[in-house]
Amino acid sequence: IRTHTLPCKCHICGKAFSRPWLLQGHIRTHTGEKPFNCQHCQRAFA
């Protein structure tokens, strides 16, 4: 039984999330954005 709403919806694929930050992380799967860099090897991560 789902007890919460899913107000945050992806405008690309329509997947819904309960929190804005979950949607923000999901959007990165579409855009390829990798904003976090490793301080040791400089690789970027989402």
From Swiss-Prot:
Domain of life of the organism encoding this protein: Eukaryota
Location in the cell: Nucleus
GO molecular function: DNA-binding transcription factor activity, RNA polymerase II-specific; RNA polymerase II cis-regulatory region sequence-specific DNA binding; zinc ion binding
Swiss-Prot/TrEMBL keywords: DNA-binding, Metal-binding, Nucleus, Repeat, Zinc, Zinc-finger
Keyword set includes Coiled coil: no
Residues forming coiled coils: none
GO cellular component terms, semicolon-separated: nucleus
SUPFAM superfamilies: beta-beta-alpha zinc fingers
Keyword Transmembrane belongs to the record: no
PANTHER family: PROTEIN ESCARGOT, ZINC FINGER PROTEIN
Protein name in the entry: Escargot/snail protein homolog
Organism encoding this protein: Psychoda cinerea
